[in-house]
Structure formats: structure tokens, C-alpha cells
Amino acid sequence: VGWQWDVPRTAEQTRIGLTPPMVPLAARTPKTQMQLRIQPNKLEQCFALTDHHVGNLGHHTPICPLDPDDDGAQLLVRRTKYESPEKIERGKWKFVRAVGDHPISEHSHIWLKGGFKPGLIYDILFTPKDCPVVGAGMLATRDCTSFLRYEVASPFNGRVDHVIGEGQSQCGRFLRTFLHLGLNSDQKGRPAFDGVLAHIAGGRRGEFNHRYGQPSVQPTPSFGHLFPFGDLPQFDPLTGRTAGLLDRHRKSRNLPKIFYTDTSAEYWRGDAGLCHTELASGDDAN
């Protein structure tokens, strides 16, 4: 199932993806912006307006601005992740593409006078032209699974005993978000998956059901790093909330059997330890 809306759709690189419904401009209330992060490895005059954390492996669909001349758009820069950003003057950058040192009118890119410098962290805040229903990918996954499992018209009709959902890394985080939203029950109340294997997903989720969501985004700050982390209810000392990843499914049933598998990388940066830790004390969760 193609569930991600912004996968490459070029002649050179085409992947199975989702063509989602779009939210009309009049329905996008209140008016909001999206954040797009750029962390250059070398001096560059311009970048495509898309996720760059996987470099040339990505080539995600560019996200063009609604108004290329919007004075409310911002370009921020900082030297380290947690320091306060500096705002770059609006007259020093444009939503255009550069050929050499010359900007041309193509609004799928951002151009900065003097270039984007390596080692710095840039954040672009702007209102996109299009607003895909990003979460439709989760419903497509559930409904396709349900169709193949239960419907008479399914090519596998009568031959399905169990269905296992397996995902690695981003797809594992997709499955964790799927469970957190309580989506394992189809429209007739039947379970889509009997089991879920989320591999190297750590304790995170992702931008899979948000306005202007970028499903491949990993770096902080991002929706994927938000509480809750563990399956069972935890107390979060920062927000004062008590919640668990599977709270919705514990109420609605159809909870699949779940396996999480992680490597040391997920403990260093994937927040995996938060899945089985008391957040206030650091002790093992009960």
C-alpha cells in the first residue's frame, strides 16, 4: 500500500505513494505555517523545499509556498540545536531556484544571498500552497488490509488466517502511530492486524497525521518525539499528564500482539529507553 503523500514522482525515481485528498484553502482555519529544516554539509545557494535528512535518497515532492512573497514567512538560523535562533532579513532570501548565482522564478526552492553555510541549522516557516490529508495514508493501510482479509472480492478470500503488520524505522514509527490513534479496528469493528512488529522504531512516532506533515522527517523538534512513549500509562513530569501509547485500543479492543525490536542506535537517539522507563525517576517501568 502506498501510504506516503510526498514520495518521489519523477521519471528517474518513482515510488509507490498516496494521492490524498486536499484540504481547500477556505477550510484551513486557523491559518498556520509548517516548519522545514535544512542542515547543509557544504555551502549551497539554494535548496528544494522538501525534507533533506536522507540526502539524495529522498527527493521528496517539493512543498511550494502559497504566496512566494509572503512577509509572514521566516528563515531562522542557529548554531546548535537548542540555542535561540536568529531571524534572517526577508530581503536576503527568496522562494526561488538558483542557476549558478542567479535566482530564477521557480517557487519549489529557497535561495539565500551568500548561501546556506555548512554546520548551521536553518528552519523555514511558511504556509504551503497545498494541504494534503496526510492521515489518509493510515486509513488506506487499515482499509486495504481489511479488504484483503475479509471481503469476498479479495484475491485472498478464504485463505487468510492471520495478518501481521511489519515496519522498519520510519514504517515502524508509522505502526506505533497507527496503534496510538486506535486505528486497528476497521469500519465494521473488526481487527485489521493480529500482530505488529515494529523494528528499529525506538520510542518515537512521526508526522503521519498532521496538517502539512512530512512523514519522513526525523530530526527534533518533531511530532514524533512527543509523549507518550510506553504502551502502558506513564506519568510525564513535564506536562503532568498520565497516558500510554495504547490507551485508545485498551478501550476499543482489537489490540494486536506487539513485538518491538531495537538496536543500540535506537537507545542512543531513538528514545527507545523511554518505552520502558519511569520518566520521573529513570527506574524501570512497572
Predicted regions and their residues:
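C-terminal His-loop and adjacent cap/lid subdomain of alpha/beta-hydrolase
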Residues: 1-286
